[in-house]
């Protein structure tokens, strides 16, 4: 059975008579790499295989997002490790910085997918 390539399916629906450009498919990786370069590269590979045009990560440091005393506002009931602080949750996933994202960008280039990241502050831009 042929795998469904979401990008081909959606872009194919635009049609030849439609003057609009086909949509860009952006896979949202966020911080789902959990600080693992191997997992980040796997997310890139799977997004490319699935037909995404780009993959988007998130760039931030916990210190710029939340007070150390802020209570968690994510539902942590399904997490293996619960926490009493939003700061600690952000800190758990802020392990990548410019060097790591440069490595991911090179991997994106090698598999033919555009690298994007949402910066959460000036320094992350």
Report residues per predicted region:
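N-terminal amphipathic alpha-helix/helix-capping segment at the start of soluble metabolic enzymes
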Residues: 1-26, 101
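Generic structural "secondary-structure junction" signal
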Residues: 6-8, 12, 33, 62, ...
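Hydrophobic faces of well-ordered beta-strands that scaffold small-molecule active sites
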Residues: 25-29, 55-57, 115-118
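Active-site beta-loop-alpha junctions enriched in small/polar residues
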Residues: 30-32, 58-62, 120-122
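Active-site glycine- and acidic-residue-rich loops that bind
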Residues: 32-38
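Alpha/beta enzyme core
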Residues: 39-57, 76, 106, 110, ...
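Glycine-rich, proline-tolerant flexible connector loops at the mouths of alpha/beta enzymes
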Residues: 53-95
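Active-site beta->alpha loop and helix N-cap motifs at the rims of alpha/beta catalytic domains
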Residues: 80-125
């Amino acid at each position: 059975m042929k795998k469904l390539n979401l990008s081909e399916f959606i872009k194919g629906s635009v049609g030849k008579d439609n003057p609009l450009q086909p949509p860009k498919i952006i896979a949202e990786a966020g911080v789902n790499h959990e600080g693992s370069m191997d997992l980040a590269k796997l997310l890139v590979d799977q997004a490319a295989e699935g037909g995404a045009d780009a993959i988007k990560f998130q760039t931030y440091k916990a210190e710029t997002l939340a007070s150390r005393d802020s209570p968690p506002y994510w539902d942590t009931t399904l997490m293996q490790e619960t926490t009493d602080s939003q700061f600690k949750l952000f800190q758990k996933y802020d392990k990548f910085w410019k060097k790591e994202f440069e490595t991911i960008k090179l991997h994106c280039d090698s598999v033919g997918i555009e690298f994007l990241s949402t910066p959460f502050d000036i320094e992350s831009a």
